[in-house]
Curated annotation (Swiss-Prot):
GO function terms (MF aspect): rRNA binding; structural constituent of ribosome
Name listed for the protein in its UniProt record: Large ribosomal subunit protein uL22
One GO term of the biological process aspect: translation
This protein's encoding gene: rplV
Function statement: This protein binds specifically to 23S rRNA; its binding is stimulated by other ribosomal proteins, e.g. L4, L17, and L20. It is important during the early stages of 50S assembly. It makes multiple contacts with different domains of the 23S rRNA in the assembled 50S subunit and ribosome.
Organism: Solidesulfovibrio magneticus (strain ATCC 700980 / DSM 13731 / RS-1)
Length: 110
């Protein structure tokens, strides 16, 4: 059986989140949690929360052994961007793009 959790509109660049997501793909949940705990990135903490939520969702399904769960998929999609303007000298303005992400974690029994 599969269980998934989704976090949307997370104020985090998808490119930076994918670097951390690649480390836990295909690993057992316990090992993935340890990897995320000791990864010094903002995205590691957020992906860890989503993974924890996916495991909690798997507990709600009857007949699922939590110890045998593995990370089947970690999908990081871009969300909408927040566009801002930074004023510069001589009347100019530079555009700042603050990116967001939609994070999906799927866990399954092996």
């Amino acid at each position: 059986m599969e269980a998934k959790a989704i976090a949307k509109y997370i104020r985090l660049s998808p490119q930076k989140a994918r670097l951390v997501a690649a480390n836990i793909l295909g690993r057992p949940v316990e090992e993935a949690m340890n990897i995320l705990k000791f990864t010094p990135k903002k995205s590691a903490k957020i992906i860890g929360k989503v993974l924890h939520s996916a495991v909690a969702n798997a507990e709600q399904i009857s007949g699922v052994d939590i110890d045998n769960l593995t990370v089947k998929q970690v999908i990081i999609n871009p969300g909408p961007t927040h566009k801002r303007i930074m004023t510069r000298s001589m009347g100019r303005a530079f555009r700042i793009v603050k990116r967001t992400s939609h994070i999906t974690v799927v866990v399954a029994e092996n």
